[in-house]
Regions:
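Primarily secretory-pathway and cell-envelope proteins
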Residues: 1-107, 111-113, 124, 128-131, ...
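Beta-strand residues in well-ordered beta-sheet regions across diverse protein folds
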Residues: 114-115, 159
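Extracellular structured ligand-interaction cores
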Residues: 146, 155-157, 175-177
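A glycine-anchored, Pro-Gly-centered beta-turn/N-cap motif
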Residues: 151-160, 164
């Protein structure tokens, strides 16, 4: 797949951003906010996901302070990603399957929506100065594991909606997607943990 997958104008056509989730999850974060938090917590390892898993209090603090938001577990497939703040939405060919509100995120200059595998061995240089993170498969197909969005600095309450295409299309078309919405707030009031499986089910590909 070429860069036409990225949300850029070609004439009057706006192409979709399609995210490959080889690691069964999506995360939202802002590079500078994340780096400041890791420095404050004296975290030097690049294995950020494992560090959060091994340090539950640090993980909860990261959610409370809007450092990142992990959305797990979802099928390891490609999803169409849209941000309502960029005037993006799913049309009537899609059916909304769920909506969850009130997750914290702090943004400085830009927001990344990426495959959670980015946090296995985090390399900030993959993101700095780039609009997307991509890689090529052995058969020459380009897949995208992260997209950058221009979002004003500040604190936000995040909502996530899951969508399914009403009439499934054949591969390589994506039949599932997520719509994110950011509402600016002055301060965070509490926080929600998206890993509370009894409360949340983000696996839109498995929702009937």
């Amino acid at each position: 797949m070429e860069k036409s997958l990225v949300n850029r104008k070609k004439g009057d056509v706006i192409m979709d951003r399609i995210l490959d989730t080889g690691s069964y999850g999506i995360c939202l974060f802002s590079i500078e906010v994340l780096q400041d938090f890791l420095k404050k917590e004296k975290v030097r390892t690049k294995k950020i996901l494992k560090n959060f898993q091994d340090n539950h209090n640090r993980y909860l603090a990261s959610l409370e302070n809007g450092i990142w938001i992990p959305f797990l577990s979802i099928n390891s497939i490609e999803y169409i990603i849209k941000l309502e703040n960029c005037n993006e939405s799913f049309d009537d060919e899609w059916e909304e399957k769920f909506v969850y509100h009130d997750f914290n995120i702090e943004v400085k200059d830009s927001l990344w929506i990426a495959d959670i595998g980015s946090f296995y061995e985090f390399d900030k240089n993959e993101f700095l100065g780039n609009e997307e993170v991509s890689y090529e498969t052995l058969d020459g197909k380009t897949l995208y594991s992260g997209f950058r969005y221009s979002v004003s600095s500040g604190k936000y309450s995040v909502s996530i909606k899951g969508y399914v295409r009403k009439n499934k299309l054949d591969y390589p078309n994506s039949n599932f997607g997520f719509l994110f919405s950011l509402k600016k707030v002055n301060e965070f009031k509490g926080f929600n943990d998206p890993r509370e499986d009894e409360r949340y089910n983000f696996n839109v590909a498995k929702i009937v």
